[in-house]
Structures are given as C-alpha cells and as structure tokens.
C-alpha cells in the first residue's frame, strides 16, 4: 500500500485529498461492534445529519467527527480490528481534541466545536437520560467510562452553557445511530464540493 498523502505544511487542497484518502483506505477498519468500518460510520453520521436538514457546517462536522482517531487511537497503516483495540484501551486519547484542532484551522468553529464536544455530548446524554447508555455500542460503552462517565450537576450546567452544545448533542445522536452494516449511504465524493465551499482558505 502506498504511503498516505503527506499533509505536513500542506495546502488546503491536499487536506481534502487527505480526507478522501482516509475514507478510501479506512473502509477496512472496523468500528463499534465490528460490523461497520470507521469510515462507513462517519459517512452514516453525515447521512443522518443531511437527512435531518442540518446546516452545511454540521454536516461536515458529522462527516469528520472521528477523524482525530487516525494517528491517535489508530495507526495510519489501516489494519483491521480497530474496534477490538478500542475495547482493550485503558486510556482516553482525546481524539475529539485532535480532530477539532485540525478542523478549526480549515473550517472554523461551527465545524470544529461540535466535533470537540461530541464526547462530552455522549456523557451529557447518558446523564440526563439513563436509558441512552443502553443504546450505545459495546466499544462506545467502554470508552464512555474512560472519558469520565456520567457528568456531575456542575458539568451538565457547563456543557449546556456552551455555544455549540445543541449542535454537539445532535451530532452525538446521529453518531450513535450510525452503526448499521447494510445501510445505503452516499460516498465521500458526495460531500467533497461542500467541504471545498466551507474551507476558510482557497482550495
């Protein structure tokens, strides 16, 4: 397999190619219960966002919400069994922060901050609705514990006060629905024009 595109000191156009490359190669990397790939999961999340009439920024956030896993939880050799690695993890690697930091520079806060908050949104939803936890995939339950578990009352209030909290909660709900193997969804190219339009600098 060829080396993934190098984005060190890269142009915005190369970032789009980088994302496209990840979505193509990452189709072998399992997610959740192992029935879907990580990239299919992200595409499904974007599908739900678009279906529900989300803003363009939130659709892109949904599409790229787990991009921070690559290079943190998952190496870029794109080997299979990633969900098994997540089940055995003993430390939270803050993929939401890695992803959001990258996306903020490219697309701005309306894309980056729902991504940054989507882990907190899981904790929030499980706290305000205890039945929500029962809907989570096995790996998501495991990482929930690593990420802090249920929120305190103060944490709930702090989350609700954040500007992008509502968007993050919407993203999280789509995120947790996006685990079906047979669902027919658009591919990455379906979103490429939208990605290029939202870039903060010229492609």
What is the meaning of each model-derived region?
Residues 1-203:
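Metal-dependent phosphohydrolase cores
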């Amino acid at each position: 397999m060829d080396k993934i595109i190098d984005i060190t000191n890269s142009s915005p156009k190369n970032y789009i190619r980088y994302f496209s490359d990840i979505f193509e190669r990452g189709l072998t990397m399992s997610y959740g219960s192992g029935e879907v790939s990580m990239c299919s999961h992200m595409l499904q999340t974007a599908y739900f966002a678009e279906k529900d009439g989300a803003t363009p920024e939130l659709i892109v956030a949904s599409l790229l919400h787990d991009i921070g896993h690559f290079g943190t939880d998952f190496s870029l050799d794109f080997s299979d069994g990633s969900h098994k690695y997540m089940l055995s993890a003993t430390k939270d690697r803050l993929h939401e922060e890695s992803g959001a930091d990258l996306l903020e520079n490219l697309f701005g806060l309306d894309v980056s901050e729902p991504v940054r908050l989507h882990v907190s949104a899981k904790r929030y939803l499980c706290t305000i609705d205890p039945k929500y936890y029962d809907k989570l995939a096995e790996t998501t339950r495991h990482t929930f514990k690593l990420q802090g578990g249920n929120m305190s009352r103060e944490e709930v209030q702090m989350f609700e006060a954040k500007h992008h909290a509502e968007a993050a909660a919407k993203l999280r709900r789509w995120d947790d629905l996006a685990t079906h193997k047979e669902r027919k969804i658009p591919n990455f190219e379906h979103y490429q024009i939208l990605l290029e339009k939202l870039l903060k600098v010229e492609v």
